[in-house]
Design a protein with these regions (language model features):
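Phosphate-binding site of ATP-dependent enzymes
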Residues: 149-156, 162-270
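Extreme N-terminal starter segment of soluble prokaryotic enzymes
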Residues: 2-7
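Short, flexible/disordered intra-domain loops and linkers
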Residues: 15-27, 91, 341-343
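Conserved N-proximal alpha/beta basic substrate-recognition cap immediately N-terminal to
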Residues: 26-146
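Short, flexible loop/turn elements at secondary-structure junctions
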Residues: 86-87, 114-115, 142, 163, ...
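A short glycine-rich, hydrophobically flanked beta-strand micro-motif that places a catalytic Asp/Glu
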Residues: 47-51, 218-222, 234-235, 309-325
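C-terminal active-site "lid" helix and adjoining low-complexity regulatory extension at the edge
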Residues: 272-314, 322-364
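Redox-cofactor binding/interface segments in oxidoreductases and associated redox assembly factors
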Residues: 9, 83-84, 159, 220
């Protein structure tokens, strides 16, 4: 086994011990192959292992290591640094928590932590007055009456699941007519089907109470974002930390939702574009776009703020809304941003930066 420091990745995306693929020739996803190459360039060896494959009594893990491009499942010494890459919905499982606790107790650096739920993320930004002015009014939903109180101040409001992602479960509520309310969703509740109905106040209260029994929600001001061809538009900035521990802009993606959808998510049928496309699309309209430097500056300020909360934070995906006056709004924060909207070069750079940041942490 190589004497290079080991960059371990806790992940559930590789085959388990009982999976036939673990005994046959196995090649992980391209991003892991890219990370293995980048790790070598930083003087590290990459080992992909499942949380249950940690062997504390033996001081080892059983994982997948690439040697000359061939991946084999083998026992290695304990990693010198660990990148946590377990899916968010699995991050609190007992074996994942046990592995995380073991490495922390041992003093092994772990990076790419969970930042918290949407309420915790909002409360952190609330402490910074300059950043909070870019955040929609937000509060934890405790009772249905809060919805009607916020609707007295804004044309529409959104109910967002505290632990939601990909637009799942978000409700848009707005006054309709004759004391009724428009209620819409791209992926509603457990059905994950679109919803577009008008409800009386009593019906809406009943719906809110029922949904809140299933899971906690955040109540948020609706921002009047720009639309192009009836599709809601927002921005995704993807940032990662480099060899010096500094934040680097990897990508700026313009997202446009399906016509009349309440979300712009790629997973919900949206499309991806570049900044030049957006400039062309709004030309001749009464819409002011911020300068690119403004977008990048705000993104980096937000990233630096969350670094104070989590010093080993490695990556951030920020969803920024744009209103017609050119103001930027922080709509969502992803500490483990998906790469499906990035191009091949950007995905490769993500892998390089993870290896760079691991090397940076090992030197501290």
């Amino acid at each position: 086994m190589t004497t290079r420091p080991i960059l371990g990745v806790i992940t559930t995306s590789v085959p388990s011990q009982n999976d036939p693929r673990s005994r046959a020739s196995y090649t992980p996803k391209a991003v892991w192959c890219q990370l293995a190459k980048a790790a070598v360039e930083q003087g590290l060896t990459l080992c992909l292992f499942r949380p249950e494959d940690l062997l504390p009594t033996k001081g080892a893990v059983v994982g997948y290591v690439s040697v000359g491009g061939t991946w084999t499942r083998t026992q290695t010494p304990l990693p010198d640094i660990v990148y946590e890459n377990v899916y968010v919905h699995l991050a609190t499982k007992p074996d994942v928590r046990a592995a995380r606790r073991f490495f922390r107790d041992r003093g092994t650096p772990l990076f790419n932590p969970r930042l918290g739920n949407k309420h915790e993320l909002a409360e952190w930004i609330r402490q910074d007055r300059a950043l909070w002015q870019h955040h929609p009014e937000t509060e934890l939903l405790v009772e249905a009456q809060q919805v009607f109180q916020m609707l007295e101040r804004y044309e529409r409001v959104y109910l967002k699941p505290l632990h939601g992602s990909s637009g799942q479960g978000i409700l848009e509520i707005a006054p309709y007519h004759q004391q009724r309310f428009s209620v819409r969703a791209a992926k509603f509740s457990n059905t994950k089907q679109p919803l577009d109905v008008a409800m009386t106040r009593t019906e809406l209260v009943r719906l809110i109470r029922r949904e809140c029994k299933r899971r906690p929600f955040l109540l948020q001001q609706g921002v009047e974002l720009i639309h192009i061809d009836k599709g809601k538009v927002d921005l995704r900035t993807h940032l990662q930390r480099n060899r010096r521990g500094k934040w680097e802009q990897v990508a700026l993606v313009v997202k446009r939702g399906r016509p009349n959808s309440i979300v712009s998510n790629y997973h919900a049928g949206g499309s991806r574009h570049d900044w030049k496309w957006l400039e062309e699309a709004v030309r001749g309209e009464r819409t002011r776009l911020p300068k690119l430097d403004e977008v990048f500056d705000l993104s980096e300020r937000i990233a630096r703020s969350y670094t104070e909360k989590a010093p080993r934070l490695a990556a951030l995906g920020l969803d920024l809304g744009l209103d017609r006056q050119g103001k930027l709004w922080l709509l969502d924060v992803n500490a483990r941003p998906g790469r499906n909207i990035l191009d091949a070069d950007q995905v490769a750079r993500c892998a390089e930066l993870h290896a760079e940041f691991a090397a940076y942490l090992l030197e501290r």
